[in-house]
C-alpha cells in the first residue's frame, strides 16, 4: 500500500546526491580518497587512532576475527541476542560460538555471563551495544585484561552512542555498520576502528585480497602495480560511491540522532498508558543513539502475542521489526547446540518488537502508531 509506514527509512537528501555526483564526476568510483576521508572522520568521531572502511560490518567482523587468528578449536563468546552474522563468521572460521544470556530488561550481555563462559579455549569476547545503548565496557574490558582475551565491540547499533563520556569505539576495537536501517547509512558498508596499528594493517590487507597495500595508494593515486599478496584475503573494500554517502550522512549525525531521541521520548511517554514494555536503560552514564525502539509484548500482560501484534499492525499499514530472534533458536544453531538454554534471551526473543523509528518520521506517523497500539490493546 502506498501509505505503508515502514519501521525504518533512510534519511537522504540533496547532500547525499551531491556527494555521489562529485564521485561520479571524479572518474574514480571505487575505493579511493573518499574512503580515506571517511576513515579520518570516524577517528575524529570516536577518538580512536585507526579506522578501516569495509563493505559491511559482517565483513569487518570476519577479518577482525581472522586478524586475531581465530580458527579450529577456538571459542568466541557472544550473546545469542544478536544478528546471526557474528555467529556465522565464527563458525565459518572453524571456531565455536559460545552463546551467553543477557540482562532481561536491557538485553545487554553482562560481565557475569561472560566470565562464567570463559575457558582456556576462549580467544575473543564480542559484546553487543544493543539498540543504540552501550554495554558495560569498563567491566567487560577488565575481564578481557584479567584473562588476556581480546574484546571486539559489535557497535553496529552504536553510531552516536557514548559510554561514560566517550564515544563507543574510543578504545580497543569496534565495528560499526552503515546498513540501510542504521543511524547513518550508505546502503551497505561498515568501518572498524582500533587503537592497534599492526591490527589495522592486517585488516587493511585482509579486506583487499591480502595485498600489502590498501586498495588506494596515496602516493600513486591508485593501487601500486607491484603490490604482493602477503596472505590470502577477501574483496571487502568499500567503493567511494558508498563512502561519499556515509560522509554526507555523518555530517548530519547529531541532527539525525536528536530526532530519533525525540521520537523515543514520545514513545516512552505514550507507553505509560499501554501494556507494552519498553527496554530498560542501562544504569551507567551514557548517550543513547536510539537505533531501535523496542517493546516487549507479553501475552499475559497485553492480551496478545508479539506475532499477532505485528500482524495486526501490518493490516493497519504499519511496519515493525524483530531484533532479534535469538541466534541459538535458528535451525542450524538449534541443531548444533540442542541443549543450550538461555532463559532471559528466550523470553525476550518471543516478545520483542521494534516499532517505527527514523528521522523523517512525522508527528502524524507517530500518532498513527500510538492510535493503532491503543486499538489493539482494546483501549
UniProtKB/Swiss-Prot annotation:
<dbReference type="InterPro" id="IPR015422">
    <property type="entry name" value="PyrdxlP-dep_Trfase_small"/>
</dbReference>
<comment type="similarity">
    <text>Belongs to the DegT/DnrJ/EryC1 family. ArnB subfamily.</text>
</comment>
<keyword id="KW-0443">Lipid metabolism</keyword>
<comment type="pathway">
    <text>Nucleotide-sugar biosynthesis; UDP-4-deoxy-4-formamido-beta-L-arabinose biosynthesis; UDP-4-deoxy-4-formamido-beta-L-arabinose from UDP-alpha-D-glucuronate: step 2/3.</text>
</comment>
<dbReference type="InterPro" id="IPR000653">
    <property type="entry name" value="DegT/StrS_aminotransferase"/>
</dbReference>
<comment type="function">
    <text>Catalyzes the conversion of UDP-4-keto-arabinose (UDP-Ara4O) to UDP-4-amino-4-deoxy-L-arabinose (UDP-L-Ara4N). The modified arabinose is attached to lipid A and is required for resistance to polymyxin and cationic antimicrobial peptides.</text>
</comment>
<keyword id="KW-0032">Aminotransferase</keyword>
<keyword id="KW-0444">Lipid biosynthesis</keyword>
<dbReference type="GO" id="GO:0009103">
    <property type="term" value="P:lipopolysaccharide biosynthetic process"/>
</dbReference>
<keyword id="KW-0046">Antibiotic resistance</keyword>
<dbReference type="InterPro" id="IPR022850">
    <property type="entry name" value="ArnB_NH2Trfase"/>
</dbReference>
<dbReference type="InterPro" id="IPR015421">
    <property type="entry name" value="PyrdxlP-dep_Trfase_major"/>
</dbReference>
<dbReference type="InterPro" id="IPR015424">
    <property type="entry name" value="PyrdxlP-dep_Trfase"/>
</dbReference>
<dbReference type="GO" id="GO:0009245">
    <property type="term" value="P:lipid A biosynthetic process"/>
</dbReference>
<dbReference type="GO" id="GO:0016020">
    <property type="term" value="C:membrane"/>
</dbReference>
<dbReference type="GO" id="GO:0046677">
    <property type="term" value="P:response to antibiotic"/>
</dbReference>
<keyword id="KW-0808">Transferase</keyword>
<feature type="modified residue" description="N6-(pyridoxal phosphate)lysine">
    <location>
        <position position="182"/>
    </location>
</feature>
<dbReference type="GO" id="GO:0099620">
    <property type="term" value="F:UDP-4-amino-4-deoxy-L-arabinose aminotransferase"/>
</dbReference>
<protein>
    <recommendedName>
        <fullName>UDP-4-amino-4-deoxy-L-arabinose--oxoglutarate aminotransferase</fullName>
        <ecNumber>2.6.1.87</ecNumber>
    </recommendedName>
</protein>
<keyword id="KW-0448">Lipopolysaccharide biosynthesis</keyword>
<comment type="subunit">
    <text>Homodimer.</text>
</comment>
<dbReference type="GO" id="GO:0030170">
    <property type="term" value="F:pyridoxal phosphate binding"/>
</dbReference>
<comment type="pathway">
    <text>Bacterial outer membrane biogenesis; lipopolysaccharide biosynthesis.</text>
</comment>
<keyword id="KW-0663">Pyridoxal phosphate</keyword>
<keyword id="KW-0441">Lipid A biosynthesis</keyword>
<dbReference type="Pfam" id="PF01041">
    <property type="entry name" value="DegT_DnrJ_EryC1"/>
</dbReference>
Amino acid at each position: 500500500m502506498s501509505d505503508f509506514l515502514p519501521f525504518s527509512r533512510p534519511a537522504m537528501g540533496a547532500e547525499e546526491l551531491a556527494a555521489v555526483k562529485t564521485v561520479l564526476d571524479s572518474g574514480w568510483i571505487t575505493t579511493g580518497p573518499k574512503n580515506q576521508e571517511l576513515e579520518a572522520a570516524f577517528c575524529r568521531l570516536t577518538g580512536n587512532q585507526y579506522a578501516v572502511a569495509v563493505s559491511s560490518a559482517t565483513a569487518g567482523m570476519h577479518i577482525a576475527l581472522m586478524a586475531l587468528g581465530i580458527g579450529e578449536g577456538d571459542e568466541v563468546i557472544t550473546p545469542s541476542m544478536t544478528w546471526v552474522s557474528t555467529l556465522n563468521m565464527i563458525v565459518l572460521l572453524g571456531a565455536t560460538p559460545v552463546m551467553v544470556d543477557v540482562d532481561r530488561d536491557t538485553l545487554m550481555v553482562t560481565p557475569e555471563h561472560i566470565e562464567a563462559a570463559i575457558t582456556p579455549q576462549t580467544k575473543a569476547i564480542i559484546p553487543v551495544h544493543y539498540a543504540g545503548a552501550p554495554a558495560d565496557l569498563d567491566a567487560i574490558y577488565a575481564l578481557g585484561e584479567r584473562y588476556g582475551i581480546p574484546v571486539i565491540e559489535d557497535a553496529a547499533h552504536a553510531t552516536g552512542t557514548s559510554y561514560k563520556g566517550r564515544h563507543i569505539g574510543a578504545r580497543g576495537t569496534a565495528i560499526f555498520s552503515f546498513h540501510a536501517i542504521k543511524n547513518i547509512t550508505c546502503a551497505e558498508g561498515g568501518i572498524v576502528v582500533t587503537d592497534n596499528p599492526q591490527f589495522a594493517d592486517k585488516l587493511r590487507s585482509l579486506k583487499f585480497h591480502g595485498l600489502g597495500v590498501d586498495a588506494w595508494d596515496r602516493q600513486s593515486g591508485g593501487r601500486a602495480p607491484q603490490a604482493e599478496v602477503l596472505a590470502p584475503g577477501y574483496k571487502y573494500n568499500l567503493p567511494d560511491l558508498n563512502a561519499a554517502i556515509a560522509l554526507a550522512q555523518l555530517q548530519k549525525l547529531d541532527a539525525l540522532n536528536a530526532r530519533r531521541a525525540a521520537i523515543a521520548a514520545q514513545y516512552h511517554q505514550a507507553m505509560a498508558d499501554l501494556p507494552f514494555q519498553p527496554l530498560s536503560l542501562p544504569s551507567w552514564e551514557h548517550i543513547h543513539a536510539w537505533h531501535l525502539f523496542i517493546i516487549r509484548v507479553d501475552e499475559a500482560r497485553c492480551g496478545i502475542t508479539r506475532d499477532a501484534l505485528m500482524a495486526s499492525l501490518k493490516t493497519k499499514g504499519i511496519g515493525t521489526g524483530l531484533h532479534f530472534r535469538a541466534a541459538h533458536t535458528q535451525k542450524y544453531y538449534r541443531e548444533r547446540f540442542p541443549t543450550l538454554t538461555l532463559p532471559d534471551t528466550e523470553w525476550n526473543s518471543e516478545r520483542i518488537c521494534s516499532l517505527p523509528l527514523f528521522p523523517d518520521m512525522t508527528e502524524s506517523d507517530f500518532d498513527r502508531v500510538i492510535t493503532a497500539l491503543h486499538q489493539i490493546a482494546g483501549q
